């Protein structure tokens, strides 16, 4: 399948700066998402969102599975994206951490992240991606 080969090449290049633990976490996350029936292109977009968080955490010497709610909030504050994009990122992070929490690898730091303020922005019409 040509599309799958191209995506695999893009994946390996795009995630080259991540440490081995983070690469393994992303591979397992990808498998879980594909098992749920999520399209490969969507999975790649979700992985890009996770990669951005992982790179941020690596710079701070914080292990991805040791992240706290505060770390997540600080990361989200650094993002210069629209409300819809930030909501999607929060959903992706919640999927990732819920998956790993169910496996017993970590606590879910996303459980107290509230998107109501962002959703209110959507109602007011702030839907342009930055």
Please provide the spans of the model-predicted regions.
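A detector for short, charged/polar N-terminal pre-domain segments
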Residues: 13-23
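N-terminal core-binding DNA-recognition domain of tyrosine recombinases/integrases
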Residues: 9-14, 27-124
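Short, Lys/Arg-enriched N-terminal segments with co-localized hydrophobic residues
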Residues: 1-6
């Amino acid at each position: 399948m040509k599309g799958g080969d191209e995506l695999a090449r893009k994946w390996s290049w795009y995630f080259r700066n991540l440490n081995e633990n983070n690469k393994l976490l992303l591979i397992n996350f990808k498998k879980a998402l594909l098992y749920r029936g999520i399209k490969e292109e969507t999975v790649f977009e979700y992985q890009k969102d996770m990669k951005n968080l992982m790179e941020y955490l690596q710079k701070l010497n914080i292990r991805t599975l040791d992240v706290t709610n505060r770390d997540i909030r600080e990361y989200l504050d650094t993002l210069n994206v629209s409300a819809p994009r930030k909501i999607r990122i929060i959903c992706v992070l919640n999927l990732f951490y819920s998956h790993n929490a169910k496996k017993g690898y970590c606590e879910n730091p996303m459980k107290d992240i509230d998107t109501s303020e962002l959703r209110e922005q959507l109602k007011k019409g702030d839907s342009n991606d930055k």
